[in-house]
């Protein structure tokens, strides 16, 4: 039986999560992409704590002059915001968790924007 797109994403996510683990020295940058928004969190898996979070639901992103929050431009802003918040807390290196999504489009744009803003992964 052929997998649906959702089942394939869930299977990829389980496979990625088996390998990707965030520590306090190098936390995990988890990305979740929905149809209209994109979310990014920096998580310390050893303490089960979210250290920083950013999304297109934040007022600074929503009030910007974007036509939509589901574009690559919006995910680039979220990438810059999450990198800025991480650097303020002294986090320079992270492990990237693409959340089962393919490294393309909005996920890739967020990752590249975070790299340009100073995060290393």
Swiss-Prot record:
One of its GO terms (biological process) is translation. InterPro entries: Ribosomal_uL18_bac-type, Ribosomal_uL18_bac/euk. This is Large ribosomal subunit protein uL18c. Binds 5S rRNA, forms part of the central protuberance of the 50S subunit. It is found in: Plastid, Cyanelle. NCBIfam families: L18_bact. The gene is rpl18. It comes from Cyanophora paradoxa. Part of the 50S ribosomal subunit; contacts the 5S rRNA. GO terms for molecular function: 5S rRNA binding; structural constituent of ribosome. Belongs to the universal ribosomal protein uL18 family. GO terms for cellular component: cyanelle; cytosolic large ribosomal subunit. Keywords: Cyanelle, Plastid, Ribonucleoprotein, Ribosomal protein, RNA-binding, rRNA-binding.
């Amino acid at each position: 039986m052929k997998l649906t797109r959702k089942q394939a994403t869930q299977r990829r996510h389980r496979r990625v999560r088996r390998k990707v683990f965030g520590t306090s020295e190098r936390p995990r940058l988890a990305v979740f992409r929905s149809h209209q928004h994109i979310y990014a969190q920096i998580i310390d898996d050893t303490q089960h704590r979210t250290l920083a979070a950013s999304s297109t639901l934040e007022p600074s992103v929503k009030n910007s002059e974007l036509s939509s929050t589901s574009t690559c431009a919006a995910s680039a802003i979220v990438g810059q915001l999450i990198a800025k918040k991480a650097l303020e807390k002294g986090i320079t290196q992270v492990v990237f968790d693409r959340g089962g999504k393919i490294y393309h489009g909005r996920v890739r744009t967020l990752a590249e924007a975070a790299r340009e803003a100073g995060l290393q992964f």
